[in-house]
Amino acid sequence: MIMPRYLGLMSGTSMDGMDIVLIEQGDRTTLLASHYLPMPADLREDILALCAPGPDEIARAADVERRWVGLAAQGVGELLRQQRLAPGAVRAIGSHGQTIRHEPARHFTVQIGNPALLAELTGIDVIADFRRRDVAAGGQGAPLVPAFHQALFGDSGKARAILNIGGFSNVSLLAPGKPVRGFDCGPGNVLMDAWIHCRRGEHFDRDGAWAASGRVNDDLLASLLADEFFATRGPKSTGRERFNLAWLQERLAGHPVLPAEDVQATLLELSARSISESLLDAQPECEEVLVCGGGAFNAALMARLAALMPAARIASTDAYGIPPAWMEGMAFAWLAHRFLERLPGNCPDVTGAAGPRVLGALYPA
């Protein structure tokens, strides 16, 4: 018997590219194939511009959305051709879209991605608009991956955390006999990416090498950690509206000029400390931390996490057969399956929603 296949599309807050994954969904989720398309530089810059107030936003958002969908449809077509599959072999696409605003305190989150056009271009049913259902129920709308983490990793019999480090970091806390919990920890790669782009024109700090060449400035670190977000307990989520280059530059203005590499080292320490302190505060008995997302490839960051959480085993999700780069794409393919089966996709203890909700909306091909 052939199990249903789903595609998952993910373009996260790092905006470096489009992840396209193909899964098979039976009793377990199986990754069948994956594909990646780099984000064109002009599209990335135009998306970033939409993350802050500006002129003519509606027309600009519509244009960016059309181009984003074109990239997504291209990626879907390429993956299907690589796998020699017809569109009819896929039950549905789970499309996260591209977040341009996330302000749950004001009761809204906005992801662009025109699922109607995506369905038209691919010939595959699309499930999209996952986050707004949770926000409508009083939740944060994020993180949504903990339910998937629970399905994949929740039967180990140990206190375990699944840590996703993308532009922002979020954690899923799994423990025997307890409901899954989770929250956003704070900036993951977003500030390090912004700083290295500002100072060196590069999009990310490969292996954390630039950060490793600098020294942490304790005074700057203290001023960064003074942001009230870090003292707030979950449910909580955040985004570029709060943590961005302007936020960093405001805090740098209150300090003597520092070597650029020392700022980068301090930003890496901010990510490591905000993760470790919030994780251990919520689950001090944690035995294992499995890391996914782009941060799993940052050797300097992984080393700091290991040093700050010596009692826990720190490893990539690769150790359990799940490539860290594809976790979120798999999660949104899985959420498409949950929608079609009319099963809830959120965790109220994570997002603060009034209860379990079926997430998403259907756009038939």
UniProtKB/Swiss-Prot annotation:
Keywords: ATP-binding, Carbohydrate metabolism, Kinase, Nucleotide-binding, Transferase. It catalyses: 1,6-anhydro-N-acetyl-beta-muramate + ATP + H2O = N-acetyl-D-muramate 6-phosphate + ADP + H(+). It is an enzyme of class 2 (transferase). GO terms for biological process: 1,6-anhydro-N-acetyl-beta-muramic acid catabolic process; amino sugar metabolic process; peptidoglycan turnover. ATP binds at residues 12-19. GO terms for molecular function: ATP binding; kinase activity; phosphotransferase activity, alcohol group as acceptor. NCBIfam families: PRK09585.1-3 (NF007139). Belongs to the anhydro-N-acetylmuramic acid kinase family. This is Anhydro-N-acetylmuramic acid kinase.
